[in-house]
């Protein structure tokens, strides 16, 4: 499978910069500290790497230089761009608006970390659109995937299919674009599902589920022309989190109305009444942190925002709350270990830390510090060992959190991904 890197570019009238790129590659032998030594850029800093450490590389690279002379990225390398003086001059937006808690803009595939920085404030001030680029690590070839114009943008959510071949791009104008990232081809645009921005996306094979600012959740079958096959109605404010269970039978949603819903895939309807299996109202702030447990299929962890700060654990069969843990700060994201009974939580004010918990005792095992603003996004590497975190401080950090991956058989290791809807023709 082609190795790809997706870039997020912040385009200004002054000096466009690459914001972030990470290449995990396909080698299981390289370590995170085997990074290239001579960066194409400046402002380079390094720090140690350990179970509670981080390895980082910061760069400022002009886009025109990068597109014509892309650096040879190696395993787990981060490119980062600090805002220059031209950006600082535009700080007319309130600080709390700079890292929108509700937007889902951070994703990981087999060999790819994609970090899309929300630049809505610069689009408003500079009247600019969003551009998404793909970078092929095997050939060092960079290509523009799509530029969203001011009228339709900015990009408010992005999510990869399970095989990492197709990308869904949610927009501020209520539309969702689907892109084939192997051929850099626009497959289709989904319309009519929402009335405002699409802030959450989740794939379930050929079903793309979208969550909007209008509170609606829509299931789209991307194989058919009339894509909308069902809706879930229950949230009264923006849907800011969506996660399908591993089986694909249950969907968890979190909203700005402080509510968590559990939905059954088979109950989605174009004429909804009371559809949810369970409705949880225990949180007292917005819920965007959702994580299905990999070792107990019915277990869901949820985290509340500012004013709540709790991690709640739910039995989604019975609807019972199994435990509630006060963390002391906003819970922005949650990740389960794939090999251990551990949970990682990402937080906001005051410490902006990542916290590692032992489940089910919820004994605090470690705190990972370094971010200076709330940690909005986390994603795991394919082996589950490395976690990447992105924060409002505009840094992407890589952590060796969960230890060695579980042993896999040759049969399992040789398993190849197939495109979820490869057997049907794409519809533009």
Curated annotation (Swiss-Prot):
<dbReference type="GO" id="GO:0016567">
    <property type="term" value="P:protein ubiquitination"/>
</dbReference>
<dbReference type="GO" id="GO:0051301">
    <property type="term" value="P:cell division"/>
</dbReference>
<comment type="subunit">
    <text>The APC/C is composed of at least 11 subunits that stay tightly associated throughout the cell cycle.</text>
</comment>
<keyword id="KW-0498">Mitosis</keyword>
<keyword id="KW-0132">Cell division</keyword>
<comment type="pathway">
    <text>Protein modification; protein ubiquitination.</text>
</comment>
<dbReference type="InterPro" id="IPR056150">
    <property type="entry name" value="WD40_CDC20-Fz"/>
</dbReference>
<dbReference type="InterPro" id="IPR033010">
    <property type="entry name" value="Cdc20/Fizzy"/>
</dbReference>
<dbReference type="GO" id="GO:0097027">
    <property type="term" value="F:ubiquitin-protein transferase activator activity"/>
</dbReference>
<keyword id="KW-0853">WD repeat</keyword>
<comment type="function">
    <text>Component of the anaphase promoting complex/cyclosome (APC/C), a cell cycle-regulated E3 ubiquitin-protein ligase complex that controls progression through mitosis and the G1 phase of the cell cycle.</text>
</comment>
<keyword id="KW-0131">Cell cycle</keyword>
<feature type="repeat" description="WD 4">
    <location>
        <begin position="234"/>
        <end position="273"/>
    </location>
</feature>
<keyword id="KW-0833">Ubl conjugation pathway</keyword>
<feature type="repeat" description="WD 2">
    <location>
        <begin position="150"/>
        <end position="189"/>
    </location>
</feature>
<protein>
    <recommendedName>
        <fullName>Cell division cycle 20.6, cofactor of APC complex</fullName>
    </recommendedName>
</protein>
<feature type="repeat" description="WD 3">
    <location>
        <begin position="193"/>
        <end position="230"/>
    </location>
</feature>
<keyword id="KW-0539">Nucleus</keyword>
<comment type="similarity">
    <text>Belongs to the WD repeat CDC20/Fizzy family.</text>
</comment>
<dbReference type="InterPro" id="IPR019775">
    <property type="entry name" value="WD40_repeat_CS"/>
</dbReference>
<feature type="repeat" description="WD 5">
    <location>
        <begin position="282"/>
        <end position="324"/>
    </location>
</feature>
<dbReference type="InterPro" id="IPR001680">
    <property type="entry name" value="WD40_rpt"/>
</dbReference>
<dbReference type="InterPro" id="IPR015943">
    <property type="entry name" value="WD40/YVTN_repeat-like_dom_sf"/>
</dbReference>
<feature type="repeat" description="WD 7">
    <location>
        <begin position="370"/>
        <end position="409"/>
    </location>
</feature>
<feature type="repeat" description="WD 1">
    <location>
        <begin position="106"/>
        <end position="145"/>
    </location>
</feature>
<dbReference type="GO" id="GO:0010997">
    <property type="term" value="F:anaphase-promoting complex binding"/>
</dbReference>
<dbReference type="InterPro" id="IPR036322">
    <property type="entry name" value="WD40_repeat_dom_sf"/>
</dbReference>
<dbReference type="Pfam" id="PF24807">
    <property type="entry name" value="WD40_CDC20-Fz"/>
</dbReference>
<keyword id="KW-0677">Repeat</keyword>
<dbReference type="GO" id="GO:0005634">
    <property type="term" value="C:nucleus"/>
</dbReference>
<feature type="repeat" description="WD 6">
    <location>
        <begin position="326"/>
        <end position="367"/>
    </location>
</feature>
